[in-house]
């Protein structure tokens, strides 16, 4: 069953479709939500990689939709407390999709625990989700990789240009190699909604993965 976040997006997509003029293919392509991201790879005192701290800023349209109906003490001003129920819904929904974060070391996939220290804030009408995704078992390996993407490409992740990924508390000499996805947007535009929903392209979004490789001495 689709999670709350995905259902909300689907309702939003339908609402947009109904506003389009007749004859226009409303849901002709993925993605439906755009996220501008930054990530921080966090290390423990012993030099092990402990998890990923994500900051995900949603696109203007989704931000506006998601904030509808949220009660605030001051109109247009959202506190963390006001947004706490929505933040909880979001992180609970992310579990179904593996938090769109995939880690691997020495040829083996690493598993994450559920997010902690999560909250939402709003700045310049943009809704941003902050959370820390801890590894179930911290990594003490010299090399590892992390990828961020939605396998179904329902959501597009674009990392900021300046300092898209940072190391926090890493041992001296550790270096990051960050690769953005190739531009396959034209192909995505040519794929209809039916193509995505029939299951044949359940991992289509892997072509749009943001790839992070870390190497330490």
Give short role names for the model-derived ranges.
Residues 25-29:
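Boundary at the C-terminal end of the N-terminal hydrophobic targeting segment
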Residues 1-8:
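N-terminal secretory signal peptides that target proteins for export/translocation
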Residues 10-23:
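Bacterial N-terminal signal peptides
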Residues 106-217:
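Mature, soluble, non-transmembrane domains
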Residues 31-58, 62-64:
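Early extracytoplasmic/domain-onset interaction patches
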Residues 61-139:
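Structured domain cores in non-transmembrane regions
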């Amino acid at each position: 069953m689709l999670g709350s976040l995905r259902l909300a997006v689907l309702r939003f997509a339908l609402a947009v479709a109904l506003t389009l003029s007749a004859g226009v293919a409303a849901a002709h392509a993925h993605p439906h939500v755009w996220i501008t991201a930054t990530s921080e790879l966090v290390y423990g005192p012993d030099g092990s990689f402990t998890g990923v701290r994500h900051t995900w800023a949603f696109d203007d349209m989704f931000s506006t939709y998601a904030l509808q109906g949220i009660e605030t003490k001051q109109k247009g001003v959202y506190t963390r407390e006001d947004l706490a129920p929505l933040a909880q819904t979001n992180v609970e929904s992310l579990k179904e999709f593996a938090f769109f974060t995939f880690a691997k070391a020495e040829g083996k996939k690493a598993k994450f625990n559920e997010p902690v220290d999560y909250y939402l804030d709003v700045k310049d009408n943009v809704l941003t989700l902050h959370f820390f995704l801890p590894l179930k078992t911290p990594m003490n390996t010299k090399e590892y990789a992390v990828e961020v993407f939605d396998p179904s490409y329902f959501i597009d992740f674009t990392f900021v240009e300046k300092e898209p990924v940072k190391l926090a508390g890493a041992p001296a000499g550790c270096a990051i190699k960050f690769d953005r996805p190739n531009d396959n947007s034209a192909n995505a535009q040519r794929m209809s909604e039916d193509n995505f929903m029939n299951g044949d392209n359940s991992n289509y979004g892997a072509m749009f993965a943001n790839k992070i490789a870390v190497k330490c001495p």
